[in-house]
Amino acid sequence: MHLELASCKSMKGVSIMNDQRIFDMELVKVESLENAVRTPFYQTDSTGGSVWVIKPGQTLPKHYHHNSDDIWVILQGKGVFYPTPDTEVTFTKGQVIVSKKGECHGAKNTGTEDVIFVSIVAPVPADYDPVSTN
């Protein structure tokens, strides 16, 4: 599965290297018909913020961050969250999902509208270790 990382140029004029402290997710988010897309909008030496867009049927593959916590604030949509490689838990807008360092996480959009969530990761940089699909 391929994940897309939006470039700063595609974020409609938003840059993660400025002093901005309020962000409009409608201006930050980037979409793709092919893959889930993560668009970074904020980073310091200790914390990073990104907005994810997962279209209906798309998956954010199961993975780990061995040294970072990852907190998701669900702004729109519904789907399933993978707290372990073999477990699915439903989620919907308005919920917060917390994955501590070393815990499996991933998601699939099972609804009819885009899943949009903000991810806050700390500390950064965060490693990305995909769950093997033996």
Where are these regions (language model features)?
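Conserved short histidine dyad/triad with adjacent acidic residue
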Residues: 50-65
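Short strand-connecting beta-turns/loops that link adjacent beta-strands
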Residues: 45-46, 67, 86, 112-113
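Ligand-binding loop in jelly-roll beta-barrel domains
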Residues: 101-127
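A short beta-strand-loop-beta hairpin characteristic of the jelly-roll/cupin
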Residues: 69-93, 103
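A short, N-terminal "cap"/entry segment at the start of jelly-roll beta-barrel domains
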Residues: 2-48, 61, 98, 130-134
